[in-house]
Amino acid sequence: MEKRKFIIQVEFAEKNFCCGLYDEAIGGAVLSTGKTFEELKKGFEDSLKFHIEGNMERGDNLPEDVAKGEYDLEYVLDVPALLRDAERFTTLSALSQICGINKKQLSHYATGEKKARPDKREKIIEGLHEIGRQALAYS
């Protein structure tokens, strides 16, 4: 049987990454924020574990796989969150050259001033992957 997977939508709002999950399988909702994506993930995973443990202690009837922590989390970042997290290892200028999206447009996406269409999001992700491949080529 395939492991249960929870899809976690990550956004960048104000100066923080934020995410949440509402699912009957966990018996409610868990929210988290963080200054960095890594901080957000750690906080969310700790909160989810705490939430599930609390529900189990109260006698809530959760699915066995959830109660045992046998599930996967998949984080899906919106475009502002993608671009803000990518600032750790690249610049908008470098990404612009690779993916062919104007730097100013990328800046508008990063601030949330403009919303990127799904095809632009894919171009950004492909550009980030290409930057990673190029970095791996160094020995």
Model-derived segments and their meaning:
Residues 1-5, 46-104, 108-110, 114, ...:
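Short, charged, surface-exposed hinge/linker loops at domain edges
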Residues 42, 108, 126:
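DNA-binding alpha-helical recognition surfaces that contact promoter or target DNA
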Residues 118-137:
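DNA major-groove recognition helix of helix-turn-helix/homeodomain DNA-binding modules
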